Each structure stands twice: as C-alpha cells, then as structure tokens.
C-alpha cells in the first residue's frame, strides 16, 4: 500500500514539474509606471510556446499582440508593445507547454 501511494505521488510530481509556470513579467503584476513600456516580457520556469497574448486598456476591447516569429518553445519572451495611453492595462496570455499542457494567466499594470 505504501509503495503504491509513493508511486502515485511520484507520477503526480513528475507531471507537475513538466509544466512551465510563469516566474516573472515585465512590467510586474500591479506595477505603476511613469511611461508605457515598449515591450512586454514573460519569464517561464520551463519552455512554453505562447499562442495568444491579449492586451486590454481600461474599458476598451482587447487586442492581440503580434506573436509572428515566436514559433518555438522558449523560456523567455520579449514582445514589442505599442501604445501611448496612460491608464490600466490587463495582459492575458495563453500558451502550450512542451508536455502538451495548455496554460494561461494574466497580470495588470498601470501607467500614470
């Protein structure tokens, strides 16, 4: 019984480690900036292929960032960002881990 439980925990842990959770973003979540960033950066623990990044500025509808040229699985992304508006931004991302697991998340920042 103990062996079976230990095996199940080992299988679960190896699957959990195969995913690539988000470690860092620039701007950081809830950051307050003095100027609009020129790029959005993501840092993942393992490799991931971003499939969609949507930016929503305050009450406006979201728009997708251009991910052409980002066809590989990477740990770090720096995606060009063009805006000249102050206010609050919501960044929503979606990606695929090397193990086939779909991941997503979001973070916010504002520009004064």
Provide a role label for each language-model segment.
Residues 1-4:
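Bacterial N-terminal signal peptides that target proteins for export
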Residues 16-25:
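Cleaved targeting-peptide boundary
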Residues 22, 33-35, 41-111:
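Acidic, low-complexity Ser/Thr/Gly/Pro-rich repeat segments typical of extracellular/periplasmic
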């Amino acid at each position: 019984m103990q062996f079976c439980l230990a095996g199940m925990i080992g299988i679960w842990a190896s699957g959990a480690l195969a995913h690539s959770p988000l470690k860092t973003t620039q701007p950081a979540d809830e950051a307050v900036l003095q100027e609009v960033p020129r790029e959005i950066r993501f840092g993942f623990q393992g490799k991931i292929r971003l499939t969609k990044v949507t930016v929503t500025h305050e009450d406006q509808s979201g728009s997708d960032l251009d991910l052409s040229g980002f066809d590989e699985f990477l740990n770090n992304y720096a995606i060009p960002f063009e805006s000249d508006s102050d206010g609050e931004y919501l960044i929503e991302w979606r990606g695929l881990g090397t193990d086939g697991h779909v991941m997503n998340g979001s973070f916010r920042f504002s520009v004064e």
